[in-house]
Amino acid sequence: METIYYLPGRGGRLHSGLGKAIHDHGFDITGRETVGTFSELVFSEQVAAVAQDLRSHFWNGSARVIANSFGAYLFLHAQAGLPAFPGRVLLLSPIVGGFYDDSLGTGLVPPLAEKLFQLARSGNMPNPKSCEMHVGSQDWQCDPEKVCDLGALIGVSATVVPGAGHVLGPRYVGQVLDLWLQ
């Protein structure tokens, strides 16, 4: 059985939610749960662990990575310090930097919030060989405009899902997985 490297969102586990859906498609799963010991690491240590996982076990053209929300942010920061990832990457509701929603009066400022855009604008952000991003049009955590802007800067396709929020929904994600995991 082929193994997918999976990075769930904050507080996520490998074998529930999206991880279960990946497994139900007939794949083994490995990666980093964003709970417990891993969540207690500082951001740079989390990024280094992901980069080491990728280099040690998934650095080949047939490797596949799926990352969701903050897991996508971890992947992108790991990718920033590596050559272009040689396999395929699927990023769902990817955090790509800081965001504030005036209408909700809430925001999100992850560690190194501007780094990805700084690297991309300077031409120093390696983009994976094959990558796609999907974000909801109503996602307040992952500004769809910023996701599309980053995608354009690094040559990665970004699909905006009309009416969807941060959770893209099992039907949409199931359809994406059906195609992407073939």
Locations of regions flagged by a protein language model:
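Active-site catalytic motif of lipid deacylating hydrolases and related acyltransferases
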Residues: 1-60
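Short glycine-rich catalytic loops that host catalytic nucleophiles or stabilize transition states
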Residues: 32-36, 159-165
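Short beta-strand/loop motif that positions the catalytic acidic residue
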Residues: 127-128, 132-135, 139, 147
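Catalytic histidine-centered segment of alpha/beta-hydrolase-like enzymes
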Residues: 40-41, 164-175
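Active-site nucleophile loop of the alpha/beta-hydrolase fold
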Residues: 34-37, 90-99
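Gly/Ala-rich beta-loop-alpha elbow adjacent to hydrolase catalytic centers
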Residues: 66-76
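Conserved alpha/beta-hydrolase "acid-adjacent" motif
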Residues: 15-16, 140-146, 169
